[in-house]
Design a protein with these regions (language model features):
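Conserved redox-cofactor binding core of oxidoreductases
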Residues: 1-76
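Residues in well-ordered beta-strands of folded domains
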Residues: 19, 47, 77, 91, ...
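Broad, structure-driven detector of short, well-ordered beta-strand segments within folded domains
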Residues: 23, 79-80, 130, 182-187
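Short glycine-rich loop/turn motifs that provide flexible caps or phosphate-binding loops at active sites
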Residues: 39, 44, 88, 139, ...
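Short C-terminal domain-edge/linker segments immediately following a structured domain
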Residues: 49-50, 121-123, 138-142, 150, ...
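Glycine-rich loop(s) and the adjacent beta-strand/alpha-helix scaffold that form part
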Residues: 65, 74, 78-84, 90-163
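Rossmann-like dinucleotide-binding core of oxidoreductases
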Residues: 149-185
Length: 187
């Protein structure tokens, strides 16, 4: 697969820490999902079902419990809390544009690097004037992005780069934390 080409090249250049990356893709059948068939179109969904996705892994399981309701076309606009400051639900706008409140014992915020800070900041109250989880004033201040790169090369023989996962691999030898550069982690 495409990782073998990247790995061999990294080894020849002297890199030591080269791996396929940590992905939610089965290498063998597990939890009712097939093993990866190395089709190479992971960004477009997974035909074999090996790649983890809430849409076809967790949501169907939750529906089977009878304790789950999926509200499509809804948008959360605020996380709410009680008088002691403990999160107790969310306010959302439903598909018809009506504002609704949903009580909750636990709220999982999983909106990646844009929507998570937006929601935390929009959840400001008199108790949390700068938004939830923002006592240090850092929510929304430090944008983080997963960088990707594409490399093109002429090879002496066919390498079938269309085989394997979309991300061939990761070389982390140069990913050294050096705070003197003005930031933490990264390249």
């Amino acid at each position: 697969n495409n990782f073998k080409v990247l790995y061999d090249g990294a080894q020849k250049m002297g890199y030591k820490d080269c791996h396929t990356g940590r992905m939610g893709i089965n290498s063998m059948p597990r939890d009712g999902r097939n093993a990866c068939l190395q089709l190479g179109f992971c960004f477009q969904g997974c035909k074999s079902g090996a790649k983890w996705s809430a849409g076809y892994t967790e949501i169907p399981k939750a529906e089977k419990t009878g304790n789950f309701e999926l509200r499509t076309e809804a948008h959360v606009v605020q996380i709410t809390h009680n008088k002691s400051g403990k999160v107790d639900g969310v306010v959302y706008v439903d598909k018809d544009g009506n504002q609704q409140k949903q009580k909750a014992r636990i709220v999982a915020v999983a909106g990646n690097s844009i929507e998570t800070p937006r929601l935390l900041l929009m959840s400001n109250t008199s108790m949390y004037p700068d938004g939830l989880s923002n006592s240090a004033g850092q929510v929304g201040k430090n944008y983080m992005r997963h960088l990707t790169a594409s490399i093109y090369a002429l090879m002496d023989k066919p390498v079938n780069m269309h085989r394997g996962t979309t991300m061939a691999g990761i070389i982390t030898d140069e990913s050294i934390n050096d705070p003197s550069r003005g930031f933490v982690g990264g390249y």
